[in-house]
Every structure is written in structure tokens, then in C-alpha cells.
From Swiss-Prot:
The chain crosses the membrane at residues 10-30. One of its GO terms (molecular function) is serine-type endopeptidase activity. The lineage of its organism: Eukaryota, Fungi, Dikarya, Ascomycota, Saccharomycotina. The active site is at S44, H83, D118. The C-terminal short (CTS) helix is essential for catalytic activity. It may be accommodated as a transmembrane helix in the thinned membrane environment of the complex, similarly to the signal peptide in the complex substrates. Its EC number is 3.4.21.89. It comes from the Eukaryota. The gene is SEC11. It is a single-pass type II membrane protein. This is Signal peptidase complex catalytic subunit SEC11. It comes from Ogataea parapolymorpha (strain ATCC 26012 / BCRC 20466 / JCM 22074 / NRRL Y-7560 / DL-1). InterPro entries: LexA/Signal_pep-like_sf, Pept_S26A_signal_pept_1_Ser-AS, Peptidase_S26, Peptidase_S26B. Keywords: Endoplasmic reticulum, Hydrolase, Membrane, Protease, Signal-anchor, Transmembrane, Transmembrane helix. Residues 1-9 are cytoplasmic. One of its GO terms (biological process) is protein targeting to ER.
Length: 176
């Protein structure tokens, strides 16, 4: 393979990666969610969602209601959690920047397959999730079991190495 072909292959790969990144950013802007697509990692939401389901999030609503399934991130952890809103209330607070009173929505969540609410998961002293600060989005659609590839890659080291070897082998075979 000559230099021109290598540069062409590299440019093609860069275009694929740039297109994927652009699609992700566009989807993030449209849904107003930093994480518009998530994979269910546990069975806490069964039977509504199974482990491995891919969820699509929407974060354009001002408020979410009791019964809505939301995805939130805890302050200390990087893993998004998919649970249902079981209680909500609103409080009036003074906005720090504008000094005007604003209504803030507070939420309590629980997994459908869990016996108790999520209070023990929240940060020490935190009673509720704040809609604007903690919620990544409300679930508006899903694709069953497609996310199992992600789970296999993160949980099984051998699968990850086999997949990388397969990708490397396919790149070598394609070049010939």
C-alpha cells in the first residue's frame, strides 16, 4: 500500500469519526441532553426495560411528571441511572444571578424492580433530585437489547480484545 492509499484510508476513517461525532452533537442539541442515548445496565427497571436496552432521552420539557421514566446522574458517580419518578414537588427560590424568584422542581425516583426509593443512592443529605441540575432527560423511546454489545465490551475483557483483534484483522485484509 502506497502513501497515497494510506492517506486516503486515514482520511476516510477521520470522516467516519467526524460524522459520528457531528451526529452525536446534533442529537444532543435537538434533545437538549448531554447524554441523549444510554444503555440500561441493571435489572432495576424490569419489566419496563431490560438490561441491554438502548434508551433515547428528551430533555426539552420544563417539568417531568410522576410516572415518567428519567435518567439522572449522581454527583459522585459517572454512571447514569434509569428510574421512575415516584414523587415531585416544587419550591420557590431566589435565583442567584437574576435575584428573581423561580420555581424549582424536586423529584424522588425509584426503580420499578426495587423495593425502596432511591434516597440511599443520593448524596449525603440530599432528599430529592433537582430537575435542572440532576436529570439528563426523560425516556421517550427505546430499542430492546441492542446495548448488550456495550455491556459485553465493558464487562468482558476477552470480548474487548477479540473485538479489537477482529477490527485490526479486517483493516489488514481490506488493505490487500
Amino acid at each position: 500500500m502506497n502513501l497515497r492509499q494510506q492517506l486516503g484510508s486515514g482520511l476516510s476513517m477521520a470522516m467516519v469519526l467526524a460524522s459520528a461525532f457531528a451526529f452525536w452533537k446534533l442529537f444532543s442539541i435537538v434533545t437538549m441532553s448531554n447524554s441523549p442515548i444510554v444503555v440500561v445496565l441493571s435489572g432495576s427497571m424490569e419489566p419496563a426495560f431490560q438490561r441491554g436496552d438502548v434508551l433515547f432521552l428528551w430533555n426539552r420539557e420544563e417539568y417531568v411528571g410522576v410516572g415518567d421514566v428519567v435518567v439522572y446522574k449522581l454527583q459522585e458517580k459517572d454512571i447514569p441511572i434509569v428510574h421512575r419518578v415516584v414523587r415531585e414537588h416544587r419550591v420557590m427560590e431566589k435565583d442567584r444571578k437574576t435575584k428573581k424568584k423561580v420555581q424549582k422542581q424536586l423529584l424522588l425516583t425509584k426503580g420499578d424492580n426495587n423495593e425502596r426509593d432511591d434516597l440511599p443512592l443520593y448524596a449525603y443529605g440530599q432528599q430529592y433530585l433537582e430537575r435542572k441540575k440532576d436529570i439528563l432527560g426523560r425516556v421517550f423511546g427505546y430499542v430492546p437489547l441492542v446495548g448488550y454489545v456495550t455491556i459485553l465490551i465493558t464487562e468482558n475483557v476477552y470480548f474487548k480484545y477479540a473485538l479489537m483483534a477482529l477490527l485490526g484483522l479486517s483493516a489488514l485484509v481490506q488493505d490487500e
